[in-house]
Amino acid sequence: MYLFFDTETTGLPKKWNAPVTDLDNWPRLVQLAWLLYDSRNQEIKSANRIIIPENFTIPTEASDVHGITTERALAEGIDLYEALNEFSSAMDDAEYLIAHNISFDEMIIGAEFLRKDVKSQLAEIPKICTMKTTTNICKIPGRYGYKWPNLTELHQHLFHKGFDGAHDALADVIACADCFFELKKSGMYQQQGSLF
């Protein structure tokens, strides 16, 4: 089964290469959305959770990107521990974890698992990054060869249109799943030497 997920956060890490155990380095989780698909590419479970901020506020610069303010998170959010346990339960069924720029999302979730002392199988499940695996498919010129496509660029390349709600975790995870299944169906992943 495929577990797609996306996070929205309080910002960016101070150091991108810091270990997950450097909890001061990694931003806090603001929103977590995930979709679990079976082997027939049918959605079987999903969640979209805003997290109640504990001992932090959401900076204006971050809420300007994803639209979630501290006030909104306090009013609409759920407890982080509950969200992590729910995601961990979904991981129990997953054969693959898939995200766009998965190395970032994995560190955000991993740091939150450590902060809450919640055990998870995050490190053990094989991962697929729709950003890094599609660089040579999108072929967007960058400073040193092709650049990593953002999710909107990948969606545009595959479907000839963007998608609504970019930087909302649910909209992003739906777009990521759509892109993955289109890549798989069209055979583009086989051409790139992927597992699919």
Regions found by a protein language model. Give the residues of each.
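Short acidic, Gly/Ser-rich segments with clustered Asp/Glu that frequently serve as metal-coordination loops
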Residues: 7-20
